Amino acid sequence: GAPGAGQAPITGWPLAVSKRNAARSRAAARGGFIMSNCAIVGINWGDEGKGRMVDLVTQDYDVVVRYQGGGNAGHTVVNEKGKFALHLLPSGIFRDGVVNILGNGVALDCESLWKELQDVTAQGVSITPDNLMISDRASLLLPWHRDLDGLEEARLKDKKYGSTKQGIAPFYSDKFQKKTVMAGELLYPGQLRSHLEDLLEWKNLTLTKVYNAQPYTIEQLMDWVAEYGEKIRPFIRDTGAFLRQAQAENKRILFEAQLGALRDLDYGIYPYTTSSNAVAAYAPVGSGLPSARIDEVIGVVKAYSSCVGEGPFTCEWFGEEAEKLRQAGNEYGAKTGRPRRVGPIDIVATRYGVQCQAATNIALTKLDVLSYLDKIPICVRYELGSQQTDRFPFPALLAEAKPVVEYMDGWKCDISGVRTWKDLPEAARKYVEYIEREIGCRIGYVSVGPEREAIILR
């Protein structure tokens, strides 16, 4: 294609503004929590239900931006169009008139994205360059990143980190070494080939000398670009300029995070973290709008704990107790299908996650899953040696921490059809109120099922 293809100037806002304004009016009427710019983030280990929350509130937003991470974790969304496991696509893709953006902080896996686009459009969802845009400054996750991820996990053996082997850590390592290719380079094939040749010489040294693996050829890489990179070219543009215009026109922007605070590279349980920043504070940088002010941070918390991967997990259940909760909550990884590690809600970790995210509002998800329990367990403190603490400890100490568990009465009834706070059983309300007090943040949303409408506004 011609140099600069996909970089057409913005000539007008492509949204159905009247429809959006009508949606906002409805939100105001029902007492929604709609602010100009909002981030929806995970408070714990990920898998909290961020996708279902983004899908719920996007009717009140103009733009949804994914600002970090890659295809290594999934967001499950259930709506009138079906059930979807999204890995790279922003969860606003199902809403008419919403522009979805993959920001510069994303690990752009063209291969996974193209397969995901095919899967979602096959279920009747329209995806065009009008409602999906890819930052020209997003870096490409290349085939060798996935190879290196698997090779390193194999080398580590029983000391592995539990990677999803999607190439995320090698990708971000290369990005910080300035050894990646930007998506915008797909618009300039001649320069792209030259850049890939330079990277190839360097990367093949690692593959062959460190891991004794097969090297790549430039022909293999160009074939990969032709098969996958070419397909996403129409979506690539200067999304920073688009977002600045949106901000100037007072459009509402929703920032969608991947994973949770406890997986954040700087604030999580290092080294059992992801390789990017999952905190809301990174949203302006990773989205391509560093001047953005975030008015609200909706932190998503599951009504119990779940975790995929290795590392300390203080409240973990095992055996039959764990399997019952896992089956009740369908706790299997959206990307890997791996059984998630599960246990009761961890107030210590959740309070820390709320603080890291500077959450202003909490969405508590999957409350309905706990309906089978006679007593609801809650980890209220940790025992470290001879002392107890309610402060989240330094990562190196976490492996020694033991949970101090207290119990509240269960409600033992199906609450999946409840839609108002007053109709929840008293025991369920007390459980929510207890969590709210202990973590120090208002719980404004309570979900009682995976469907879009299975939500209680407080």
Where in this protein do the model-derived segments appear?
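Short, Lys/Arg-enriched N-terminal segments with co-localized hydrophobic residues
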Residues: 10, 18-34
